[in-house]
Amino acid sequence: MDLSFKPEHETFRDEVRKFLKDELTEELLEAGKLTASVFSEVEFSSKWHKILYKKGWIGASWPEEYGGTGWDDMQRYIFRSECASAGTPSPTAMGLAMVGPVLMKHGTQKQKDFYLPRILSGEDFWCQGYSEPGSGSDLASLQCKAVRDGDHYLVNGTKIWTTH
């Protein structure tokens, strides 16, 4: 098995390194260092997300038909590896890694057309809010309710762990 980079992958790695050098401000690098989990603080995640979106690099694992990069496996590896080495903050991951792929597979065409571009651009922000006092993440015992109130929903309840 040959795991060496092809010349086009070396060129791509150089491009990624230059991009990171040019775009990573001290503020973003500091935010990357302070990341306590897989998620960076929202302010910095959003900034980094928008920089990647402007470059056309936010949808690294999304199919091209939904606005993804069209990168091969090696390019995705190079990009993620270089971002990790550089200490970037994470982009807003919930929409990119969880909501977007579910919509791609199970969403209606109308949902895909509306939400997927907004996830990529960072215009829409998604989060997960499962855990509740006394329930943890046991989804069958959750007490929080959403009730339609005109053209929106009123959500009542308490969450103890929410992530973006």
Go through the PLM ranges and name each one:
Residues 1-13:
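Intrinsic disorder at enzyme termini
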Residues 9, 20, 56, 63, ...:
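Buried hydrophobic positions in well-ordered alpha/beta secondary-structure cores of metabolic enzymes
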Residues 18-24, 52-54:
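N-terminal glycine-rich anion-binding loops that anchor highly charged ligand groups
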Residues 28, 90-96, 126-132:
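Core alpha/beta catalytic barrel or barrel-like domain that forms the active/cofactor pocket
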Residues 28-52:
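Short secondary-structure junction/hinge motifs that connect adjacent elements
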Residues 32-41, 64-68, 99-105, 131-134:
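Conserved short loop/turn motifs at secondary-structure junctions
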Residues 46-123, 164:
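Internal helix-loop-helix
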Residues 68-69, 110-164:
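Glycine-rich, Trp-frequent "lid" loop and neighboring beta-strands that shape
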